[in-house]
A protein has these predicted regions:
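Conserved beta-strand-loop-short alpha-helix elements that form
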Residues: 103-118
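A short acidic, glycine/proline-enriched capping/turn motif at secondary-structure boundaries
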Residues: 49, 73-76, 94, 112-115
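Short acidic-glycine loop/turn motifs at beta-strand connectors
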Residues: 34-39, 91, 165-170
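Short histidine
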Residues: 114-175
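Extreme N-terminus nucleophile/cap motif
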Residues: 1-57, 67, 158, 176-199
Length: 199
């Protein structure tokens, strides 16, 4: 099902343990995006925890940074680096496969989008199709991310959760997120499973 973790500017970054747990519970690849110098920088396609943690550590993120992390469980288009998240907001499908990209706006998704789900689709995920066919036509400028009516319309179409970041470091969330000491999680798979044995 995936998980999104959004760290807005002024909030802590997730711990290494939290990152590890999210990857362990959503093991089909990871990525992240951050805003700097008016652009969103996306790095994705990390298919193992070590390469992901190395990349994140090299960024030296602090509470000043606005960062969205994503960990995937594949529901369409298989397990591959290209369909990990985040994606650039674009109307061109070929842009969805870029592993390292700068763009005005980036998107991460959690859930299944029935509108664009197609079990026979082997190349593009429901998220990639939703972004190119729907979102790219709806979001035209940075102010759109602060338009509650537009975000509600996107939520009704997607039927799931999204984090959308623009180059100004603003993060809009669509759907209900869990606030855990400032971090926003799209579900509870950031928590370690705790087993209790009863004698």
């Amino acid at each position: 099902m995936c998980i999104i973790c959004a760290s807005k500017s002024g909030v802590r970054q997730p711990t290494e343990r939290e990152l590890f747990t999210m990857f362990q519970n959503n093991p089909h690849g990871a990525g992240y995006m951050y805003a700097r110098d008016g652009r969103v920088h996306i790095h994705k396609g990390f298919m193992d925890i070590d390469s992901f943690l190395s990349a994140v550590k090299a960024e030296h993120f602090t509470a000043k940074d606005s960062v969205v992390y994503h960990f995937r469980i594949s529901t369409q288009a298989g397990v591959n680096p290209e369909m990990t998240h985040p994606f650039p907001l674009s109307n061109r499908l070929s842009h969805m496969k870029a592993l390292d990209v700068e763009c005005p706006c980036g998107v991460a998704h959690n859930g299944i989008i029935r509108l664009t789900s197609d079990p026979s689709q082997r190349e593009y995920s429901d998220t990639a199709l939703f972004i190119t066919h729907y979102m790219a036509r709806m979001v035209h400028g940075l102010d759109d991310l602060k338009d509650a009516q537009l975000l509600n319309r996107i939520e009704r179409l997607a039927g799931s959760k999204l984090a959308i970041m623009d180059g100004s470091v603003y993060i809009a969330t669509v759907g209900n997120f869990i606030n855990e000491r400032g971090l926003l999680f799209s579900n509870d798979s950031y928590r370690e499973l705790r087993w209790r044995h009863r004698a």
